[in-house]
UniProtKB/Swiss-Prot annotation:
It comes from Listeria monocytogenes serotype 4b (strain CLIP80459). Keywords: ATP-binding, DNA-binding, Endonuclease, Hydrolase, Nuclease, Nucleotide-binding, RNA-binding, rRNA-binding. It holds the Pfam family Smr. This is Endonuclease MutS2. Residues 710-785 form the Smr domain. The lineage of its organism: Bacteria, Bacillati, Bacillota, Bacilli, Bacillales. Gene3D superfamilies: 3.30.1370.110, P-loop containing nucleotide triphosphate hydrolases (3.40.50.300). ATP binds at residues 335-342. It comes from the Bacteria. The gene is mutS2. Homodimer. Binds to stalled ribosomes, contacting rRNA. InterPro entries: DNA_mismatch_repair_MutS_C, DNA_mismatch_repair_MutS_core, DNA_mismatch_repair_MutS_sf, MSSS, MutS, MutS2, P-loop_NTPase, Smr_dom.
Amino acid sequence: MEKKVEAILEFDKIKKQLTEFASSSLGEQAILELAPATDFQVVQKTQLETEEGAKIIRLRGSAPITGLTDVFAHLKRLEIGGDLNGLEIYQIGSNLRVSRQMKNFMNDLLEIGVELPLLGALSDELLVLKEVEEDIAISVDESGKVLDTASEALSTIRRTLRRTEDRVREKLESYLRDRNASKMLSDAVITIRNDRYVIPVKQEYKGHYGGIVHDQSASGQTLFIEPQSVVDLNNERKALQAKEKQEIERILAEISASLAAWINEIHHNTFILGRFDFIFAKARFGKAMKAVTPHLSDAGVVHLIAARHPLLDAAKVVANDIYLGEDFTTIVITGPNTGGKTITLKTLGLLTLMAQSGLQIPAQEDSTIAVFEHVFADIGDEQSIEQSLSTFSSHMTNIVSILGNVNQKSLILYDELGAGTDPQEGAALAIAILDASHAKGASVVATTHYPELKAYGYNRVHATNASVEFNVETLSPTYKLLIGVPGRSNAFDISRRLGLSENIITEARSLVDTESADLNDMISSLEEKRNLAETEYEEARELARGADNLLKDLQKEISNYYQQKDKLIEQASEKAATIVEKAEAEAEEIIHELRTMQLNGAAGIKEHELIDAKTRLGNAKPKTINKTIPQAPKQKPHVFQEGDNVRVLSLGQKGTLLNKISDKEWNVQIGIIKMKIKTTDLEYIQPEKPKKQRIITSVHSSGSPAKSELDLRGERYEDALQKVDKYLDEALLAGYPQVAIIHGKGTGALRTGVTEYLKNHRMVKSIRFGAAAEGGNGVTIVEFK
């Protein structure tokens, strides 16, 4: 992919935004090196990595990546035999801690069944060096200071050093407390000069304390003197400091030597953690943009649903559907320069670069984007001042280069194709360039304001027209892309809105040839019809989305129901077993007493009778109920066909197959609802054999046979109950096992009255409100005895 195209489409701005989501310089560096891949499998892998990262962010909110540092330079120094300072050692220890935390974090997710094939494998590459990590933790802190716990010798030296310093300060403080201190000292403070404790003495009293003068004030009136009484203590302090420094150097050298044995492992851990940081940055970036993982096409198919330009304000940007590669491979966006056409080009181009870089894209679920080997763009004024080329020449130079490198795995974006020269010649060139691009097998999206190109989408089977909608009422573009509708001139309408005389507009219209006027009218009609169709489509899509959510909720509830059912059965079984065990124990005791009585000759009870009684008691003990549903013997798999009766296992509902979507999915009619169901969730139901009909002889009034439902909506309360009474008799005579009584929702008075009546009817076995597909609580289902 050319860097020039990345610059034109502003991919560098996307990377800059992405760096804000990295937790380390390693993640930032990986982002700076990010470039679109052209190999389909590589793109699939990077998209899956990002999707797994997004899954982790959804489940856990964040990952334990904080504290990661670039330590490659430190490892290089160890490699050549150098020693590290305390801060460098701490940073390596921090990376080892992050490695351990990340591995544990990933293992926890994998243990609870979260599917993370790529990131799980990446986590497996991390090596936990717990002992090395702990050695560093007790040796240095986050500032790089070597801790007392690093060695016993260092702890002893520092303890002695602190006591010595306390003695020095105690002695000097006694001078400060002396009654003559205010007279002899410039200030009642202890300070340090040349790394030795001193007090500020007035010039005239320098001989009073003896000792060594280490410094004086600018005026010379104050001398900073180390009194003779603390010289030896300060000397001892300096000696201890030298020992401390020597011990610290020994400790750092020892730790550096131990780390040198793990250079390769630490290097690899750091690299893997950098990958994790990069992947989580992509995931968090996608979440912030409300982006999705797109389906990928290796056949040049693009179907973006509600795609948004990622660099524009999400609250204001207009989302557009963009599709290409199935019914047509070339889109020509025509119409005046009212804004929106170039944004469409950049949106498609930039989302392609993002997807091929493993980034999620700002669009709706189920969007598809193609993986291209090349993305070419001729957008904006690329005039070269050095070469003194005109705008037209600059564009043409770029187009010549594009046509020389394009192939059938290419996406070409032409902005204002043929502009900058005579309109007639420019339009002719544009048509020829589009034909040449198609001949190379490329996918093309081009914008132009030449009306001559409107016919291109009609005259070429591989092409279609498009335009950006313009609101004449507000005199501004809506930025809504209309694929299949060519752009039209709005000059007359705009002029009228701005107050131009109607006479002038009428005269202007008369000067336009009839064909152009008819074409504009046709385009206007197409726009209206398209807007209507799009509104209906959005409503249908919203309904489908709602149905899908209901299905998921229903499946979840059914799953919870069966889990609860199994739990209750198991509890009941255990309780029953406890009761029987108690009974057995009592029976054993009784049998023992009877046997004792028999031995004593007190009763004529036979031994086999005792054994038989015990056996029957043992058989009475229930076995724990297996909550696994018995499996029917395996039969040859049924090949599903349209019209088959099936059971949807996850819902426990029967349905009919409408049409096959793919090998993995069918459209199924369940009651009044049509749903997409996975093939693995379907079970074939054999057609029922016709049963012999019972002949029921009954005497009733001649008339229409009873229906399976009674509609009471609009009826008065008393009339409704009379109709229910009569209808139940007719339904029973007709042999219906159950019927539906429709009373509507309303205020609930009629529903309550009907329900109370049915509860007391001698032939009613049960009643319930209808399911959602049957009419909800506006319908009562009656089952007869």
